[in-house]
UniProtKB/Swiss-Prot annotation:
Keywords: Acyltransferase, Cytoplasm, Transferase. The keyword Transmembrane does not apply. It catalyses: N-terminal L-glutamyl-[protein] + L-leucyl-tRNA(Leu) = N-terminal L-leucyl-L-glutamyl-[protein] + tRNA(Leu) + H(+); N-terminal L-aspartyl-[protein] + L-leucyl-tRNA(Leu) = N-terminal L-leucyl-L-aspartyl-[protein] + tRNA(Leu) + H(+). Functions in the N-end rule pathway of protein degradation where it conjugates Leu from its aminoacyl-tRNA to the N-termini of proteins containing an N-terminal aspartate or glutamate. This is Aspartate/glutamate leucyltransferase.
Length: 258
């Protein structure tokens, strides 16, 4: 019998299940476990190949006769916010982002719970308990950070700490970028467009860190839930031939970037 090294990834295929993004279709996923000393290296490699991380699992779509899910990554150092995005950044100038270790808190869960109850009450995560949330945050064998977004207070300039928590993003730090694993926000702050704000903030963070990309996950044309990811240009989209560049004008370059 062949003996496999613990560091050799084994891949598995899920059974078909209803697609949560495109009605009438079914999805399948290929997945592997991110464990061992080389979990970080494997996560980097798989992310470059279109995988996403959920806890200690890396997965990507492997659907029969459907290739609608397209991995996208924003080119951070070339990105320029649009006029509307600049207005949004100005509107949220009273928010400070604080990078922390991936430690779950009751304050985070309160915002997370409110977000699910109002935005995704019928989704696959709707029944997550506080223990489920803790697992989502803590169960990582790769370099992960929790970025908390808080309202500024009169003392923020002195302490660096904000006040009320209104949003958070669980983010992996890769060798070539930041990967937004999951983000959530206070639904009563809808006028702030906090989902967009967090993406813009991650692009700025990646640029400051000298990292070329921000990985947003899957862009799905025609899906109300996922189509927004195509707005952050220039970006690259993963095709069978490699990562293809989409210019700020929306035009696709035919040759793979790397």
């Amino acid at each position: 019998m062949t003996q496999h090294s613990r560091d050799t990834p084994q891949f598995y295929l899920t059974a078909p299940s209803p697609c949560p993004y495109l009605p009438g279709r079914h999805e399948r996923k290929v997945f592997t476990h991110l464990v061992g000393n080389k979990a970080g290296e494997l996560n980097d490699l798989l992310t470059h190949g279109g995988f996403r991380r959920s806890q200690s699992i890396a997965y990507r779509p492997a659907c029969d006769q459907c290739r609608a899910c397209v991995s996208v990554r924003v080119i951070a150092n070339e990105f320029k916010p649009s006029r509307n995005q600049r207005k949004l950044l100005a509107r949220n100038a009273d928010i400070v982002g604080e990078q922390r270790n991936p430690v779950p808190t009751s304050e985070q869960y309160s915002v997370f719970r409110a977000y699910l109850d109002q935005r995704h009450r019928h989704g696959g995560m709707a029944d997550m308990t506080v223990l489920d949330y803790a697992m989502m945050v803590e169960d990582s064998h790769v370099q992960t950070r929790m970025i908390e977004y808080r309202k500024r207070t009169p003392d923020t300039g002195i302490t660096g700490r904000g006040g009320e928590l209104i949003a958070a993003a669980l983010t992996d730090v890769l060798g070539d970028g930041l990967s937004m694993v999951y983000s959530f926000y206070e639904p009563n702050e809808q006028h702030r467009s906090l989902g967009t704000f967090m993406i813009l903030d991650h692009i700025a963070r990646a640029r400051r860190l000298g990292l070329p990309y921000v990985y947003l996950g899957y862009w799905i044309e025609g899906s109300k839930k996922m189509d927004y990811k195509g707005r952050y240009l220039p970006q690259q989209r993963l095709a069978p031939s490699g990562w293809l560049r989409i210019d700020a004008s929306g035009e696709m370059q035919p040759e793979p970037q790397d």
